[in-house]
Amino acid sequence: TSKEDFVICEIGGIVGDIESLPFVEAIRQFSNDVGKKNALFVHLTLVPYLKASDEIKTKPTQHSVKELRSLGIQPDIIICRSERSIPLEHRKKISLFCNVDIKNVIQTVDVKTIYEAPISFNRENLDTQVLEYFKIKSKKKVDLNPWKKITKIILHTKKSINIAIIGKYVDLKDAYKSLDEALTHGGINNNLKVNL
């Protein structure tokens, strides 16, 4: 038995990939074991914007959810990532064809830094929807000022420091991600933008 109030399990990749199938089956069984009201499925999808035709496409999300449902999992919340704001009529379409309440179709428009994501999720009421699902009453208003401060430092600080990383895989963007993040955190703590 675990003493945690929440356990977050992320399964990356694309729904239906052979590598992730055992994990998808494990969370399906886990949900059955603990009871549906004690497990929440959040599905993150890309809602592409096509510049040539100036339109947002919901079909990839619909197909992704269809594939997930074929594996026995109905998402409770769908987070729709897009480079543009998703109009309400498109969100309603996703809600209808994916069988998810419209208030649980959450958009997240691409941000300049990952540290803006909590602010974006709060703006879309993701935190409220999660608490509501588990029937937890929020006792206080969320204080996003620390996230706003971090975002401001990253995006607007004039002072910067240049650091070179020497390594075999420096051309791969995520090869030294943990080192990159550690240096970014050090920069935030010292009001500096870190240029790698």
Describe the function of each predicted region.
Residues 1-5, 11-196:
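N-terminal beta1-alpha1 cap of cysteine-dependent amidohydrolase-like domains
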